[in-house]
């Protein structure tokens, strides 16, 4: 039993760790792309729009890989932690379902518009698409963190006669003090990751005297976001 539990933990830990590499960068790049689109809209300088298009391609690829690596993690709730899922499913399934039904579809729908609809949407419509992708990605992070925070610090629940859990206050689950702290920590880490990735690529381009104009934008936006 102890060996099986250890294997389950290692298995799940590897899956979660590998998966989180991708949504962390996705959530970090989303607000930076909005910043680039905002600067392009206000200044009418093509360099900002071109920079946003460049990072949007990376965002799109990273988003797809993040979705694919997240599917095995969901399956492992049943394969590795079946009894836990059975007992607590009435609680943790709520934020996880909202992540899929609301924020994931919001992000996915507007990402499609953002990737392929620039010419049809116009500049302001394209900016709104970028902003909604940002909102969707950060909402996804919030619902996932809320589910994790409840596992660490259970609130707003009752135990039923069969031993399972039920929610007594959905807002109590979402406003869990641990969830708010974890969410702030997670989003700061994601933003720093995205900022450093952008600044690092810009620095690499500058060192190689390649696309200097874009490289300066990458470094400036990345460093400012990372420091702030």
Q: Locations of the language-model features?
A:
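Polytopic transmembrane helical bundles with strong interfacial aromatic enrichment
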Residues: 1-228
């Amino acid at each position: 039993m102890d060996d099986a539990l250890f294997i389950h933990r290692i298995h799940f830990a590897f899956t979660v760790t590998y998966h989180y590499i991708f949504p962390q960068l996705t959530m970090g790049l989303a607000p930076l792309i909005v910043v680039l689109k905002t600067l392009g809209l206000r200044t009418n300088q093509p360099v900002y729009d071109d920079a946003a298009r460049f990072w949007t391609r990376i965002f799109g690829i990273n988003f797809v890989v993040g979705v694919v690596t997240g599917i095995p993690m969901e399956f492992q709730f049943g394969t590795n932690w079946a009894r836990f899922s059975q007992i607590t499913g009435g609680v943790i399934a709520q934020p996880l379902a909202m992540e899929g039904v609301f924020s994931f579809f919001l992000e996915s729908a507007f990402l499609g518009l953002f990737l392929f609809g620039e010419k049809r949407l116009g500049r302001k419509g394209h900016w709104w698409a970028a902003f909604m992708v940002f909102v969707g990605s950060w909402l996804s992070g919030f619902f996932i963190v809320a589910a994790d925070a409840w596992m660490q610090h259970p609130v707003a629940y009752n135990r039923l006669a069969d031993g399972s859990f039920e929610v007594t206050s959905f807002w109590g689950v979402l406003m869990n003090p641990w969830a708010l702290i974890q969410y702030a920590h997670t989003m700061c880490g994601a933003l720093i990751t995205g900022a450093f990735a952008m600044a690092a690529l810009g620095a690499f381009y500058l060192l190689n005297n390649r696309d200097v104009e874009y490289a300066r934008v990458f470094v400036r936006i990345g460093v400012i976001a990372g420091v702030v």
